[in-house]
Swiss-Prot record:
Gene3D superfamilies: FAD/NAD(P)-binding domain. Disruption phenotype: Deletion mutant does not exhibit an obvious phenotype and produces sulfide and acetate in amounts comparable to those produced by the parent strain. Optimum pH is 6.5 for sulfide production. Keywords: Cytoplasm, FAD, Flavoprotein, NAD, NADP, Oxidoreductase, Redox-active center. PANTHER family: NAD(P)H SULFUR OXIDOREDUCTASE (COA-DEPENDENT), PYRIDINE NUCLEOTIDE-DISULFIDE OXIDOREDUCTASE DOMAIN-CONTAINING. The gene is nsr. This is NAD(P)H sulfur oxidoreductase (CoA-dependent).
Amino acid sequence: MEKKKVVIIGGGAAGMSAASRVKRLRPEWDVKVFEATEWVSHAPCGIPYVVEGIAPKEKLMHYPPEVFIKKRGIDLHLKAEVIEVETGYVRVRENGEEKSYEWDYLVFANGASPQIPEIEGVDLPGVFTADLPPDAVAITEYMEKNKVEDVVIIGTGYIALEMAEAFVTRGKNVTLIGRSERVLRKTFDKEITDIVEEKLRQHLNLRLHEKTLSIEGRERVEKVITDGGEYKADLVIIATGIKPNVELAKQLGVKIGETGAIWTNEKMQTSVENVYAAGDVAETKHVITGKRVWIPLAPAGNKMGYVAGSNIAGKEIEFPGVLGTSITKFMDLEIGKTGLTENEAVKEGYDVRTAFIKANTKPHYYPGGREIWLKGVVDNETNRLLGVQAVGAEILPRIDSAAAMITAGFTTKDVFFTDLAYAPPFAPVWDPLIVLARVLKF
């Protein structure tokens, strides 16, 4: 295969995974990555922990730029914004100049951007998003220069809860405002969110079913106005969701899928020849339903980049799709899921049965055991496990086990007879996941 030119737009997880994979398989190829910020291979999921003060901002880059440039031979351009895409070339604004670069293969890995509500005051000093590493730097610097006691977070998703924990841990008075009637409404059923909300109310002012009308202040933010009240604010975090950055792809005529993200096939190819997409900008299929979904999560993004890079370099491999496996926490309460919730399964047309159990993470006689709640969703016709949600303590092994089981097509009987490890310091003899399968019946 002759030497090719590969251009990758975006130097985050998906982009650098794609670039690294191409260079590993085709070290003689010219691989260029254009990243609009000065951060490469960054970890946005770490932003709350930088703000909390338990992680240094420098660690938000998995590898420094020198690793990709010197060790992997990638032509990495930082602070380089791609402003135009045409067949065979991209136009880049870099160091105050514009320059064109040719490509034989193109990868869109330019991620997603925060959805900012159209309300007055979002541009006031002291109002932030928590989407990229520069946001973590800006928030911490603002707190160092200004007295911050009252923090308002607009949103009730993962980022909102994680940022809330960061500020609560730092001793701030936190108000969490959401338009919906439940936190985490899109990803968890009510049995789970009821427990989460009870925990939140122990540590902050939770305001649900309130629409934010404006953010007000003179020289900087001072308060947030909703249709239900007025809340003092020295700092505001807007965490109302994200949207895929598809504008550049549209310039090239790339198909945008029904989810609003770039359509891709199993090889991460788009509708345009030799053009790929990976990460938060791309949609994929759901492992259970086979339908198109946009679930922007880091593990899948990395794998999408790996698959795109492999196929570009001639090593065919397919991305099988996602389950939406995810986990977060608020203080000492862990929250996670994999597969379909009951609400999602019913919307997809499944006849389901469910079970919701409370268990302990260790035998009653062994110290250190804590409560865990699990909800299982099963196809009533086939007994196939469709989804598991968990809240409480030590949920990770249960969620990860369930993800593997769902991927493999396990029924409740298969789950029940899975030979899980047991010893009193680690788990009860009847693991909560096995108990869940028993209650779901087979």
